[in-house]
């Protein structure tokens, strides 16, 4: 039995438990879950939001101009211009917010943490941030030694009815409608792969296996699985956009539609109004066919007979129509300003002048800072969940990407140099110049120069070296091939 959640009738973790271990019943449950998920409001919002993110507008694309005949019957307007111009503002806003928070990567207190999370951790975090802002939620799967990210449109979450925790989920994908449907059921005690080919029932592709597999290889037996284990909790963590997990487009979609519709109407008016029409004089006895023939002759021969002296012959005078522009332009400018306010986006044109002070620039970032502060809390909660699964005790921090007055910021750092150590000053100056990723290489070169000075001058005082020890890591395992 389905239960209501946030306006959608979705299946829950308790529904999965009620199915039991019968594979036929579990496959029916998976098929039903996917169908209900694709028909849910959250899925439809995510699908539309992805189109807005890509620079399309599904609302105006579905809109058709209608005209009515003398009997009052509606017909599709096939005559007037119907340009449909979509803006990319939503995509710009999402990319700006993600880049602002995660553009410089995630920093940890222990340098070894990044290595244990995998080389692509920062890239996966950027992907997760985009998915979460677009659809309202994304899902991160810790797969032994690296992070994998699922979007809402490919993952059915199964929440616990009692505490709201994510306890199971179904990832599904299908290249085309006539291609096989693949699905993976993730549970606390392992995962199972399924496949549903065209015209066939769903079958088990791979039996349930634990998430961490221990492998051994020998010449006689080759590679074999000799042991397996699971994580202390469900290995998929949701990244929500706020407590309600709402798309960033929620509440602002109508304004985006208004801007796109207004822009489209202006182009349509120009298309329709940028015409030359003819005023025919002394043609009262001519019908529509005569008018067309007369104008065709004027266009081809460029001659119009006006009659003899005192005789009022037929004449043709060309005129033009100018489309209204100023009023529409003012409306478009107003809607753009409203979008920046509603989305709390940073408008770089406000600080485009080269003489902006650091205080003025910082003030321009206030709306974006307020919005990103909320999203940062969600990102931090997500990362802490991943760290717990990986068995890492650490905390993340972030360096936000800002437009700054470099000379003023540099002077501020150097004025306080007596109160900071070399490491802090070096990191700050590199960050200001956009070279924060060069810190490790710079420190290696400085250490090499230090050693060279010591070798050339034996009396030069050497710095004490402290031995750093690291905890031993667990034995090798095999990641899930999801």
Region roles according to the model:
Residues 1-3, 255-271, 281-287, 451-482:
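Glycine- and charge-rich intrinsically disordered segments
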Residues 93, 101-105, 313-322, 448-449:
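Short glycine/proline-rich turn/loop motifs
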Residues 114-122, 130, 246-256, 329, ...:
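Generic detection of long, well-ordered alpha-helical segments
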């Amino acid at each position: 039995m389905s239960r209501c959640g946030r306006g959608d009738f979705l299946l829950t973790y308790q529904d999965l438990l009620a199915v039991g271990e019968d594979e036929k019943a579990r496959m029916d449950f998976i098929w039903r879950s996917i169908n209900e998920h694709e028909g849910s409001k959250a899925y439809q919002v995510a699908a539309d939001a992805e189109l807005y993110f890509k620079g399309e507008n599904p609302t105006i694309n579905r809109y058709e101009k209608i005209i009515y005949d003398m009997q009052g019957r509606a017909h599709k307007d096939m005559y007037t211009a119907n340009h449909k111009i979509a803006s990319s503002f939503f995509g710009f806003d999402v990319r700006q917010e993600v880049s602002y928070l995660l553009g410089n990567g995630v920093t940890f207190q222990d340098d070894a943490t990044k290595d244990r999370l995998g080389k692509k951790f920062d890239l996966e975090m950027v992907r997760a941030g985009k998915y979460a802002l677009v659809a309202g939620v994304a899902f991160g799967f810790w797969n032994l030694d690296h992070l994998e990210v699922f979007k809402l449109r490919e993952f059915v979450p199964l929440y616990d009815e009692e505490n709201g925790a994510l306890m199971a989920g179904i990832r599904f994908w299908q290249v085309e409608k006539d291609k096989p449907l693949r699905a993976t059921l993730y549970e606390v005690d392992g995962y199972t792969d399924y496949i549903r080919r065209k015209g066939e029932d769903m079958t088990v592709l791979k039996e349930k296996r634990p998430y961490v597999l221990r492998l051994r290889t020998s010449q006689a037996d080759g590679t074999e699985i000799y042991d397996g284990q699971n994580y202390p909790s469900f290995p998929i963590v949701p990244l929500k956009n706020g407590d309600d997990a709402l798309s960033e487009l929620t509440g602002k979609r109508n304004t985006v539609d208004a801007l796109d519709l207004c822009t489209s109407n202006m182009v349509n008016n120009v298309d329709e109004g940028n015409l030359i029409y003819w005023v025919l004089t002394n043609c009262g006895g001519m019908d529509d066919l005569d008018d067309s023939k007369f104008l065709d002759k004027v266009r081809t021969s460029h001659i119009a007979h006006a009659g003899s002296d005192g005789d009022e012959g037929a004449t043709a005078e060309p005129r033009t129509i100018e489309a209204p522009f100023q009023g529409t332009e003012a409306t478009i400018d107003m809607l753009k300003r409203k979008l920046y306010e509603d989305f709390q986006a940073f408008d770089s044109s406000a600080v485009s002048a080269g003489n902006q002070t650091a205080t003025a620039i910082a003030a321009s970032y206030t709306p974006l800072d307020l919005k990103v502060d909320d999203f940062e809390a969600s990102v931090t909660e997500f990362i802490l969940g991943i760290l717990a699964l990986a068995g890492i005790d650490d905390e993340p921090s972030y360096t936000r990407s800002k437009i700054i007055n470099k000379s003023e910021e540099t002077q501020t750092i150097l004025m306080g140099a007596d109160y900071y150590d070399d490491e802090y000053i070096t990191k700050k100056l590199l960050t200001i110049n956009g070279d924060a990723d060069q810190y490790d290489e710079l420190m290696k070169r400085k250490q090499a120069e230090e050693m060279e000075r010591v070798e050339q001058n034996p009396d030069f005082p050497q710095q004490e070296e402290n031995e750093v020890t690291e905890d031993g890591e667990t034995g090798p395992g095999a990641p899930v091939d999801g």
